[in-house]
From Swiss-Prot:
Compartments where located: Cytoplasm
Organism name: Azotobacter vinelandii (strain DJ / ATCC BAA-1303)
Descriptive protein name: Ribosome maturation factor RimM
Record's comment describing the protein's domains: The PRC barrel domain binds ribosomal protein uS19.
GO biological process: ribosomal small subunit biogenesis; rRNA processing
Amino acid sequence: MDMTPASADGLIVLGKITSVHGVRGEVKVYSFTDPIDNLLDYRFWTLRRGDERRQIELVRGRPQGRLLVARLKGIEDRDGARALADFEVCVPIAQLPRLDEGEFYWHQLEGLRVVDREGRLFGKVDHLLETGANDVLVVRPCTGSLDDRERLLPYTDQCVLRVDLAAGEIRVDWDADF
């Protein structure tokens, strides 16, 4: 799975510009992709901050520690780079690589109903957490839920029995009392 939050405008957020790097207009980018340099595979970025949108071309980039350093077309100095701080880096969802069968992007799982083997509704996937060992579904109660408890369910083969995107449902093997 890949942790990628989707948006209603057909874009997916893959990173965020955090600050400037040096004096020649480069920016530091926190990448949400795994590995982080996958973000550099996209030549054109849509930068988004609130209602503001800006199309920009990636000239080059490189990993530096836990961040990326990127040179963007038309950004030639520190002031231009500073003006881009806090912009989200987005690309069209349609440009994401196709996944193998049984693999999903996080944005595809968010909002799905979670039911147990008996069909009892636990709630809907609010978001996911990356723990290192495995990803975790954060399931929040919704209308018709079994109870009002938030549940953290491991995204493992033992727990997740089936993901049905068409039906909007994830079937799990999980004790309702746990």
